[in-house]
């Protein structure tokens, strides 16, 4: 377990560096195509550093805002707070900030950069449809993400992919409507080839970023399932919760493909999609979560 935590920390810094390099290369390609020269290169470096820094410090706030999460204040959330407090004592974690998303679909996610700066959000549908034992299993799963430092890795990836997609879109729009600047020194056959490569990179970069995000491994969810069960010492609780998630037909209205990876199960899949395990290898490779049936079976074998 401790080895996995250390591996996640190393993977986090590696992925941060890779996203930084990709953003930098993207802005340099943008600069080359528009011919801004040395000033543009300096701006590219500044933008890349700012985006990497912003991903690290503000990604949790962005994820919560995009999901329209609000603080879980009020007596109606007392059970929610009590369960998290008990699990945090058992796990040796500080209590994270608790949020709720007004949505009838049962789901939950954790975000933040470390256990001291973490947050957990659940939908109102989860609070209504899960009994105490099932809710405890889901919350233990989310707290395991915090303890294993999965939250930083996932949240940074979500924010960085969004930034890369935005940069690529802006670059292509400038190319389409404005073209290259006049007087650019990049001329001739070599310049044309480099321009072609830069243009292709603007198109391919968002796809590369998505592949990097999915490379953060679906095993992260399996590890959180097992870690959560070790925390509650009651596998049937999480098993029953996952079965309810599998059978529920609702999708989270405030979720998006950018934040899909954060949730305990894909918030955009219908019941039919959750049950479909016969997709092509390419479809399976781009899934953000392991099949719920597989996760349930692993827990039943414990």
Report each predicted region and the residues it spans.
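Short, hydrophobic transmembrane alpha-helix segments
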Residues: 25-39
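Select transmembrane alpha-helical segments in multipass membrane proteins
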Residues: 199-204
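Polar-ligand-bearing catalytic/cofactor-coordination segments
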Residues: 1-20, 33, 40-42, 50-194, ...
């Amino acid at each position: 377990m401790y080895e996995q935590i250390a591996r996640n920390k190393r993977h986090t810094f590696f992925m941060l560096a890779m996203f930084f390099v990709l953003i930098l290369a993207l802005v340099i390609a943008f600069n080359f195509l528009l011919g801004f020269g040395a000033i543009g290169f300096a701006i590219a470096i500044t933008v890349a550093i700012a985006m990497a820094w912003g991903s690290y410090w503000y990604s949790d706030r962005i994820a919560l805002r995009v999901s329209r999460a609000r603080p879980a204040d009020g007596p109606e959330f007392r059970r929610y707070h009590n369960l998290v407090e008990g699990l945090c004592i058992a796990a040796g974690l500080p209590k994270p900030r608790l949020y709720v998303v007004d949505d009838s679909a049962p789901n939950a996610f954790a975000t933040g950069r470390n256990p001291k700066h973490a947050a957990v959000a659940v939908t109102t549908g989860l609070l209504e449809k899960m009994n105490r034992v099932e809710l405890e299993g889901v919350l233990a799963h989310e707290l395991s993400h915090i303890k294993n430092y999965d939250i930083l890795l996932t949240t940074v990836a979500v924010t960085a992919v969004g930034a890369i997609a935005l940069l690529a879109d802006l670059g292509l729009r400038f190319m389409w409507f404005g073209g290259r600047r006049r007087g650019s020194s990049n001329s001739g056959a070599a310049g044309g080839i480099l321009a072609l490569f830069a243009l292709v990179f603007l198109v391919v970069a968002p796809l590369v970023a998505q592949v990097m995000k999915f490379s953060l491994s679906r095993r992260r969810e399996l590890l959180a399932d097992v870690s959560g069960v070790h925390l509650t010492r009651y596998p049937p609780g999480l098993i029953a919760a996952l079965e309810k998630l599998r059978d529920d037909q609702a999708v989270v209205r405030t979720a998006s493909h950018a934040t899909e990876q954060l949730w305990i199960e894909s918030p955009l899949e219908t019941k039919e999609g959750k049950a479909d395990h016969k997709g092509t290898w390419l479809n399976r490779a781009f899934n953000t979560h392991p099949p719920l049936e597989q996760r349930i079976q692993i827990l039943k074998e414990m």
